[in-house]
């Protein structure tokens, strides 16, 4: 009997796949929608969250940020492509826009160029949309569930014409099936990760009530440690989707192909008179010479700078040890009580 040599694959030890976070296909707000609309949300459950690509900006020397993001993405069943961050010292003065503040140092210039590189990649590759991440952020173990709810609310918001109405998503028409994206049609920016935003007084706000994935109001934080949370005017465990106003930080934002092209022209080639996040906020708001654009914000934010306490309830990063051991008893660390804190008033 002839001896059949073993193949290389037969020599390999077949390791079982390590635990990942369980995915919920039906959420609090998607349970009552039509099967057709539910199917239209299914792309959000894929490895790029319903976008064509996910790009993360990472300085090569920050291997700690990259390793944590790689691990967080793996257990969340997300695929991220990394873009190399930029040191401002390496950016030639000749390539900077004519409208630039001379006092800007390497940090602001490097951040601007890194985000422009991401936008340029979207245009060059012809991606219909992409989610751009900074590498020091985190998200909830129920991210895909949160994004499905956000998508329903975003679509309702984008289809609502003017008015200062507050709309409960449970009372809204969610039967529409968007043609271009599960998040709705004709958006420029979906700003899902930031350091704070204002809620508009002159436009619609779509509310996700009884959203148990949100933190309590006293645990909601922003870049302004002395500011009272904007969500204090709503009941606990409410998330608001509205026009992205006076946004701060570009931790996570999705960009359409059309928006990426316009941003290359407006911000990459014309002006650098503010840090990139401020420029993007003004571009969205339609101020300082920019036209108004369709930018959707969410509060409390879905992605945030990493902190054991804050705006993310069951942080993947904070619960990594539990996740890797298959434990679903996730924990959240409450913000410490501090005397005189305006959030406790």
Task: Identify the role of each PLM range.
Residues 1-133, 137-345:
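An acidic/histidine-cluster motif and surrounding catalytic segment
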């Amino acid at each position: 009997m002839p001896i059949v040599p073993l193949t290389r694959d037969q020599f390999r030890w077949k390791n079982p796949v390590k635990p990942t976070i369980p995915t919920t296909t039906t959420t609090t707000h998607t349970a009552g929608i039509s099967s057709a609309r539910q199917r239209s949300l299914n792309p959000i459950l894929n490895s790029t969250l319903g976008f064509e690509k996910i790009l993360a900006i990472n300085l090569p020397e920050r291997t700690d940020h990259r390793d944590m993001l790689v691990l967080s993405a793996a257990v969340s069943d997300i695929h991220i492509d990394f873009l190399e961050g930029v040191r401002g010292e390496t950016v030639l003065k000749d390539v900077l826009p004519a409208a630039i503040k001379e006092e800007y140092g390497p940090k602001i210039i490097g951040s601007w160029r890194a985000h422009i590189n991401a936008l340029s990649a979207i245009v060059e590759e012809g991606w219909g949309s992409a989610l751009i991440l900074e590498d020091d952020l985190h998200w909830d173990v129920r991210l895909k569930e949160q994004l499905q709810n956000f998508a329903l609310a975003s679509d309702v918001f984008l289809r609502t014409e003017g008015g200062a109405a507050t709309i409960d998503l449970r009372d809204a028409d969610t039967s529409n099936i968007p043609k271009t994206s599960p998040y709705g049609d004709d958006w420029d920016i979906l700003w899902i990760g930031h350091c704070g935003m204002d809620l508009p007084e002159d436009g619609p706000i779509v509310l996700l009530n009884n959203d148990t994935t949100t933190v309590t109001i006293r645990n909601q934080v922003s870049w302004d440690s002395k500011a009272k949370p904007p969500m204090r005017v709503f009941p606990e465990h409410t998330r608001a989707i509205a026009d992205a106003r006076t946004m701060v930080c570009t931790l996570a934002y999705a960009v359409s192909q059309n928006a990426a092209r316009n941003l290359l022209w407006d911000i990459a080639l014309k002006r650098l008179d503010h840090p990139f996040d401020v420029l993007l906020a003004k571009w969205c708001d339609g101020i300082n010479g920019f036209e108004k654009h369709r930018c959707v914000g969410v509060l409390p934010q879905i992605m945030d700078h990493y902190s054991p306490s804050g705006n993310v309830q069951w942080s993947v990063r904070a619960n990594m040890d539990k996740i890797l051991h298959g434990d679903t008893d996730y924990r959240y660390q409450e913000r410490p009580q501090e005397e005189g804190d305006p959030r406790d008033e």
